[in-house]
């Protein structure tokens, strides 16, 4: 049986929720500061140690014009490499947690190392040539000095570091997903479903009962509230073989009796409503009577 919407026995309809889009969060820095000074200090340390390693290569060579059999490595950059290595050590000390920062001292020492390396390259003694390791060594020392000076300017507030870009956090908490909406509405309990196949004769007969204005037995095609009529499993010739009495409403609903016969004689049979099931299906109260077979009396 079915329940009309709003009645106490009617099941609550499940409302389909909307799909809430995932809102990715962006991870911010803990202190909101740029990490550019940290990267520059790391560069100062790396460039200082690179200059120290390049000093083992041929920075200066003895020319062959000094005499036969004379040639080879003449020496190293000397003081410039020592000063650059000192700047790298001081910058590395400032990277330690809870350590005092020496950005000013590192910048001064790094600039001094760059000036010494440039001076040694320009004031080359006669009979000496610059080896291949001297040029990358000078480049490392100069870049170290530039990085140390930029760190000092950032620390003093002369220049401003760019704001850190928010990074997408793949492990961030996504927004909650709402309930998915139902595909269609569930049929009422007792509502006739679709028939898989057609009935014989190309017609589909649905049982008819009392009128829908009483909230009782309605046609099986559309739900009228109350107790829905169940479709008859038999149709066609099988229905004609069975005769059913008038549909009896359930307990608590008003019953309806056939109307009295109007007139007499042979017309009385045609005036009464036919409550038995005909070959085409059942007829309800108030349905027009079927015309009797045979010739109509004049």
From Swiss-Prot:
It holds the Pfam family DUF5336. Signal peptide: none annotated. Keywords: Cell membrane, Membrane, Transmembrane, Transmembrane helix. Coiled coil: none annotated. Residues 188-298 are annotated as: Disordered. Residues 191-201, 212-228 have a biased composition (Gly residues). GO terms for cellular component: plasma membrane. It is found in: Cell membrane. The chain crosses the membrane at residues 42-62, 77-97, 102-122, 134-154. Residues 202-211, 229-246 have a biased composition (Low complexity). InterPro entries: DUF5336. It comes from the Bacteria. Residues 247-261 have a biased composition (Pro residues). It is a multi-pass membrane protein. The keyword Cell membrane applies. Residues 268-291 have a biased composition (Polar residues). To M.tuberculosis RV0954. This is 34 kDa antigenic protein. It comes from Mycolicibacterium paratuberculosis (strain ATCC BAA-968 / K-10) (Mycobacterium paratuberculosis). The lineage of its organism: Bacteria, Bacillati, Actinomycetota, Actinomycetes, Mycobacteriales.
């Amino acid at each position: 049986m079915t329940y009309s919407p709003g009645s106490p026995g009617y099941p609550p309809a499940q409302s389909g929720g909307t799909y809430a889009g995932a809102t990715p969060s962006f991870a911010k820095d803990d202190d909101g500061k740029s990490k550019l000074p940290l990267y520059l200090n790391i560069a100062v340390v790396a460039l200082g140690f690179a200059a120290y390693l390049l000093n083992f290569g041929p920075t200066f060579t003895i020319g062959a014009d000094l005499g036969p059999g004379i040639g080879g490595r003449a020496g190293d950059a000397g003081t410039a490499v020592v000063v650059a290595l000192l700047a790298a050590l001081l910058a590395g000390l400032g990277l330690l947690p809870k350590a005092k920062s020496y950005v000013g001292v590192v910048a001064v020492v790094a600039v001094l190392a760059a000036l010494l390396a440039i001076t040694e390259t320009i004031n080359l003694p006669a009979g000496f040539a610059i080896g291949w390791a001297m040029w990358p060594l000078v480049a490392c020392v100069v870049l170290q000095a530039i990085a140390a000076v930029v760190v000092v300017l950032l620390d003093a507030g002369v220049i401003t570091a760019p704001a850190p870009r928010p990074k997408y956090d793949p492990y961030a908490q996504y927004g909650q997903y709402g309930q998915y909406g139902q595909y269609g509405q569930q049929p009422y309990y007792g509502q006739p479903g679709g028939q898989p196949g057609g009935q014989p004769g190309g017609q589909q007969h649905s049982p008819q009962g009392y009128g829908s204005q009483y909230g009782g037995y309605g046609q099986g095609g559309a739900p009228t509230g109350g107790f829905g009529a169940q479709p008859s499993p038999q149709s066609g010739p099988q229905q004609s073989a069975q005769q059913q009495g008038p549909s009896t409403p359930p307990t608590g609903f008003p019953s309806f009796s056939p109307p009295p016969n109007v007139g007499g004689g042979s017309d009385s049979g045609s005036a009464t409503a036919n409550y038995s099931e005909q070959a085409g299906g059942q007829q309800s109260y108030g349905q027009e009577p079927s015309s009797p077979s045979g010739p109509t009396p004049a």
